[in-house]
Amino acid sequence: MDPRKVSELRAFVKMCRQDPSVLHTEEMRFLREWVESMGGKVPPATHKAKSEENTKEEKRDKTTEDNIKTEEPSSEESDLEIDNEGVIEADTDAPQEMGDENAEITEAMMDEANEKKGAAIDALNDGELQKAIDLFTDAIKLNPRLAILYAKRASVFVKLQKPNAAIRDCDRAIEINPDSAQPYKWRGKAHRLLGHWEEAARDLALACKLDYDEDASAMLREVQPRAQKIAEHRRKYERKREEREIKERIERVKKAREEHEKAQREEEARRQSGSQFGSFPGGFPGGMPGNFPGGMPGMGGAMPGMAGMPGLNEILSDPEVLAAMQDPEVMVAFQDVAQNPSNMSKYQNNPKVMNLISKLSAKFGGHS
């Protein structure tokens, strides 16, 4: 398994231990069902932790969208302009009461909750929004497992322009009944107030799919173009980034190949130099002119006409030649003569130099 995936899984498990409410989101429903099917038990979510997680998620979404708008400002792909008319500042009120989902509910409590619900709807129709909130909260505390109560209270929070509170209620309603259209509708409207265009479009589209609503459809038509613009911008940005990464990868491969080929050429040059000059210190600069005693015809300059020359192995097999080649004084004199044969007269009285020249002349002369 990919080590990165294992690391991500380990981090996810750690997060779940710290905040079990992560497992109670709709996205994690499949994981809860699997854990329970294996005989495990998913710990109950704390509403405080859940609310904090929702707030963090909203901040992450907003940060992601802001990053898309601000990253690489010099690039054409960062030029994203969105009409944010109607977007408001996020509410920061303390999380609302959600009731005890593990409480034992009696029929009397359910009846009383229905009465509170009816009174809340009447208050809502009369424009008494805060009173409606209070009555819906009373109903929720009496029957905390009824999804419609959270959805109704969320609708009032939207009217009060408290989108984060509305989102918390909708999240809870969806956990209880993910097939109800109302929570998606009001959560979509709350996201629209926050400028979360993609989230708003997803929720409103799902609400219309579950139970078509003209009001939700009208808002979907408003937010969808902006959501599509953001999605297209993201795809364009990711495509540019992928192209840039591919280009950089190609450049790295090209550079590595060039360095490898350069190293091969240098190695080949060293190998050829070694085979040409063997162990001769300093080589034979300027070639070996044909003015050695005994004659070395055709060997001026770059040493043409070498078909009759003895091999270096044969020359170096002579111990006296090899010893002379290791003598710095002899090699300096030899190179001096090789570059300018007329300088040989300077070494007429040097037996070591003349001995080497005589031996080489004899060897080359014998193979001419």
Swiss-Prot record:
GO biological process: chaperone cofactor-dependent protein refolding; negative regulation of protein refolding; response to bacterium
SUPFAM superfamilies, sorted: TPR-like
Residue stretches of biased makeup (Basic and acidic residues): 49-72, 256-271
TPR repeat coordinates: 113-146, 147-180, 181-214
Recorded GO CC terms: cytoplasm; protein-containing complex
Domain STI1, first and last residues per copy: 318-357
Keyword Ligase: no
Modification Phosphoserine occurs at: 345
The keyword Magnesium is annotated on this UniProt entry: no
Pfam families: HipN (PF18253), STI1-HOP_DP (PF17830), TPR_8 (PF13181)
Subcellular location: Cytoplasm
Alphabetic keyword roster: Acetylation, Chaperone, Cytoplasm, Phosphoprotein, Repeat, TPR repeat
Chain residue ranges for the region called Disordered: 38-81, 256-299
Biased composition (Gly residues): 280-299
Entry GO MF terms: dATP binding; Hsp70 protein binding; identical protein binding; protein dimerization activity; protein domain specific binding; protein-containing complex binding; protein-folding chaperone binding; unfolded protein binding
N6-acetyllysine PTM positions: 352, 359
Quaternary structure (record): Homotetramer. Interacts with HSC70 as well as DNAJ homologs and HSP90. Interacts (via the C-terminus 302- 318 AA) with GRK5.
Function, in words: One HIP oligomer binds the ATPase domains of at least two HSC70 molecules dependent on activation of the HSC70 ATPase by HSP40. Stabilizes the ADP state of HSC70 that has a high affinity for substrate protein. Through its own chaperone activity, it may contribute to the interaction of HSC70 with various target proteins.
Homology family: Belongs to the FAM10 family.
UniProt protein name: Hsc70-interacting protein
UniProt organism field: Rattus norvegicus
Gene: St13
